[in-house]
Amino acid sequence: MHDRFLRACRREPTDVTPVWFMRQAGRYMAEYRELRKKYTLLEICKTPELALEVTLQPLRLGMDAAILFADILLPLEPMGAPFEFAKGEGPVIHEPVRDRAGIERLRVFEPEEGLGYVLDAVRLIRKELDGKTPLIGFAGAPFTMASYLVEGGKSSDYRLTKQLMWSDPEAWSALMGKISEVVRRLLRAQVAAGAQAVQLFDSWVGSLSIDDYREHVQPHVRYILRDLEATGVPVIHFGTNTGALLEAQRDAGGTVIGVDWRTPLDKAWQRVGYDRAVQGNLDPLLLCAPRAVAERRARAVLEEAGGRAGHIFNLGHGIIPETPVDTVKAVIDLVHSIPRASLQGEPDR
């Protein structure tokens, strides 16, 4: 197997820095846009053969890992909170959950029953990859999932989410407990189906203060991540705008800590500790900059990592649809062209 990515997750030396990108399969690729002319996003997610096709599409660019094509909100439907993707609006939850009665109605389900198509896709992709490229599974983290449920979709300030968290901590804990159990089971099931690493996406957790994170979120994330340790697969713990939360994220768990572009990678690694691998952290919009600028800034990220074992090159969030494929390929090629040993920095430890 081409295991550069998995070796880096375990902080083992690699020849060059491994690279993959969040949303590496998606609308920036012409072949994906062609597929979307025939199928909706949910149709692709719910059809294992289509999820396989989309998962494999970007690998021609040279990524060191494949990531399952799915959506973090898929568990909401079997939990009893159906949603749709409204054009121009993003996800819309038809019946937001904002009180104890709504929380009580949410179901904790078995993944093979509620999300069997996701696990079928994992099995299909793993078989097709045939050991050539490792497969990453994923799920949304409890706070991000809860914010969608409470807000009814995207939010600019998470006002309703925070109001519930502060006004009724017991109800909030019950909501987070149900989501955490669903996420734990789903990630466990993905590993059993063949995922060789998993990522927990906490896209909106950066809206919280460190105190609120530690009190209202960290225990639930820790529950998931500590359980996953028993599987033996690497777990990537990722959030955006989490510069104030890095130490708390580390304490919650994860083999690898994902870092966004707002915090310099060298400073972030010092804070989480060199006993963890780190992932990141190019600003995704730099892939829309002139190629020379993108390459220069990518090299700067590598230099901040200092050649230390345990760095996985990625973006600070997902690739945006307007990104030129040629620039994505150029950055991947650049990362792979620089021997890790040639980068100045601390020795492996």
Curated annotation (Swiss-Prot):
The record marks 71 as: Transition state stabilizer. Pathway: Porphyrin-containing compound metabolism; protoporphyrin-IX biosynthesis; coproporphyrinogen-III from 5-aminolevulinate: step 4/4. It is an enzyme of class 4 (lyase). One of its GO terms (molecular function) is uroporphyrinogen decarboxylase activity. PROSITE patterns: UROD_1, UROD_2. Its main location: cytoplasm. NCBIfam families: hemE (TIGR01464). Homodimer. This is Uroporphyrinogen decarboxylase. It comes from Sorangium cellulosum (strain So ce56) (Polyangium cellulosum (strain So ce56)). The lineage of its organism: Bacteria, Pseudomonadati, Myxococcota, Polyangia, Polyangiales. The gene is hemE.
